[in-house]
Amino acid sequence: MVFRIIRTNYAFFLPYLLLLIVVGVLQLTRSQEQLMQWVNVRNAPAADEFFPYATYLGDGVFFVIVCLLLAINNRRIGLMAFASFALSSLVSLCLKQFVFSNSLRPLKTFEHSTYQYHIIKGLDIHSYNSFPSGHTTSDFALFGMLALLDERKGRGWFFLVIAALTGYSRVYLFQHFVEDAYVGSIIGTVSTVVVYLLMYRWVAQYQKKDRPTV
């Protein structure tokens, strides 16, 4: 069933797999500091304006709002989306608070560095609980779910682009390392697939025309 979902939603999962491979190889051949500097040096005024807003697409409040909007059309679809949010958030929170509670964010890690990092003025940047990225976890869970629910499967790449940009924003804004966003994306995507597998038949029974396509 998992392979069937991946095959049906190829427009999302194929480019996502390629993204995982490319970024994974980069992490094997470069340090997190090098990757951070690579992203940081590629800053621009337009990006400084864009990413502080784009990053809110990974905020839990935004996820809940989308769940409520989905519930207006189909209550069970809304509940399934919320279950994805709950599972992905729970996994991310447990890792942050109990397993990797001492993980430092870039600001704290490089506070004595001689390298002049570009940091957007007025931005509230955190220092602790870096791994994994909660925003990236939530946004991949959300847009992964939207890709699965969309009957026009060819648009899956669109949801992936939005999710990837939101994840990239966490590194650009100096809130997370690449590895934080990388693992967060996996947690979010896997959580959505698990919830979808467990609940899509239940959703289909409620209103056949709103049945998630597998």
Where are these regions (language model features)?
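Interfacial segments of alpha-helical transmembrane regions
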Residues: 7-15, 66-97
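Membrane-embedded catalytic cores of phosphoryl/pyrophosphoryl-handling enzymes
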Residues: 114-214
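N-terminal transmembrane-helix/juxtamembrane module of multi-pass inner/ER membrane proteins
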Residues: 1-63, 96-123
